[in-house]
Amino acid sequence: MAVKIRLKRMGANKSPFYRVVVADSRAPRDGRFIEQIGYYNPVAKPEAEVKLNEELALKWLAEGAKPSDTVRNLFSKAGIMEKFHNAKLAK
């Protein structure tokens, strides 16, 4: 089973927010997911609101889950990708 870390769209019309979820790559964008690891609100003022569970994100990355491009950018800004690469190189 190929697992991806991606965004699940929630919210009202023209006022979206997203949950960062771990899901089977074959599942629909807003369909079934395995685990929720955070959320992302791009509409929040003055800047986008992001909350991520770092431990769960690192666990799923270590197990081979592939992040989408947007999630990879969110992880990079939060410093999660750097920690993952450092842990990978330390092995």
From Swiss-Prot:
Keywords annotated in UniProt: Ribonucleoprotein, Ribosomal protein
SUPFAM superfamilies xrefs: Ribosomal protein S16
UniProt cross-references to Pfam families, sorted A to Z: Ribosomal_S16 (PF00886)
GO cellular component: cytoplasm; small ribosomal subunit
One GO molecular-function entry: structural constituent of ribosome
InterPro entries for the chain: Ribosomal_bS16, Ribosomal_bS16_CS, Ribosomal_bS16_dom_sf
GO biological process per UniProt: translation
Keyword Cell membrane applies: no
Presence of the UniProt keyword Ribosomal protein in the record: yes
Family per similarity comment: Belongs to the bacterial ribosomal protein bS16 family.
Protein name, entry field: Small ribosomal subunit protein bS16
